[in-house]
A protein has these predicted regions:
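Adenine nucleotide-associated cytosolic modules
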Residues: 1-179
Length: 179
């Protein structure tokens, strides 16, 4: 089966019923590998909820986003193993207790303008990361977030660590994770 468009992640700004629509989208994706395109180069609260379902359901996914000044690719999560987006978001909340509130506000606001060049760069890098994973070579986004700026600078890699409150690492503690 080839790639297909699954839909836009519903947000509170979409009106009543957005949570039901988000659950429906997550169920529709089921176990199909997916590229999650964000509104911006950060994860807002609504996107976090959908991504958390993908992690819990062990759906292979890659997070991609672009804004006016920066773009991100990653992390790529395979079979629910992390470090994952939830690890990154929990760490962000640990470092900045107001992040959860800000993240919820970002889900209400209209998305920022996207730079065309950054959107193309993010799409190209996402394709490169998926190709690496499919070929069985190490994908730089597997346990990291890659970022680039408006000037077209080189991609930088920020390695992620597993967060103790995230379920992505629990399988390894229980001895059920291979690898």
């Amino acid at each position: 089966a080839g790639a297909r468009y699954a839909g836009v992640i519903p947000k509170p700004r979409d009106g009543m019923g957005w949570q039901v629509d988000a659950e429906r989208l997550a169920e529709e994706v089921a176990v199909s590998p997916v590229i999650v395109v964000l509104d911006a180069p950060w994860v807002d609260a609504a996107e976090f909820e959908v991504l958390s379902r993908f992690i819990d359901q062990r759906v292979n996914h890659l997070v991609v986003g672009a804004g006016a000044n920066t773009a991100r690719v990653g992390p790529m999560t395979i079979a629910g193993r992390g470090p994952c987006t939830r690890c990154d978001e929990l760490l962000q909340q640990d470092m900045d207790p107001s992040w959860r509130t800000l993240s919820a506000q970002l889900a209400l606001d209209d998305p920022p303008a996207r730079g065309a060049v950054l959107s193309v760069l993010a799409a190209a890098e996402a394709a490169r990361q998926v190709e690496s994973a499919v070929q069985g070579t190490h994908s730089a986004s597997l346990d990291a977030v890659l970022r680039t700026g408006r000037g077209g600078s080189a991609w930088t890699r920020r390695a992620l660590i597993r967060h103790t409150k995230c379920s992505c690492w629990w399988a390894s503690v229980n001895g059920t994770e291979s690898g």
